[in-house]
Amino acid sequence: MGNLMSLVLVALLFSLSLAVIADTSNDATHVKEEVKPSTEATDAIEAEVEVNDAVVEPQQGLPGGGCRFGCCGGYWWNGLCIYCCRSQAEANEVVKTVEPQKEEAKP
């Protein structure tokens, strides 16, 4: 009787695994139907990233890990700044050059 129960259990597990494999392979045939973002969405994201990147720059490496115009990014575990701010005049100049590109992206 114990052997019969083991055989039934193995058959049940085998049929369950076949059902899972069949379902998975059915899902794999529909992979070609991917959703791609519209160009409007990607243009808006790229413009936003350019504006954000224009304001900050990587750690400038001043002695002691300080930044000349303050810290615009988070602090690392040892207290050093991740991104240093630019001077206000330089940041305004860069933002003005990026803004026309952002307006062109709008339809």
Curated annotation (Swiss-Prot):
Which keywords has UniProt assigned to this entry? Signal
**Does this UniProt record's set of keywords contain Ribonucleoprotein?**
no
Gene Ontology CC, one term:
extracellular region
Cleavable signal peptide: 1-19
UniProt keyword Signal, yes or no: yes
Q: Name one GO biological process term.
A: seed dormancy process
Q: Which domain of life is it from?
A: Eukaryota
Q: What does this protein do?
A: May be involved in the acquisition of desiccation tolerance during late phase of embryogenesis.
User: What is the name listed in the Swiss-Prot or TrEMBL entry for this protein?
Assistant: Late embryogenesis abundant protein M10
| Protein's organism | Arabidopsis thaliana
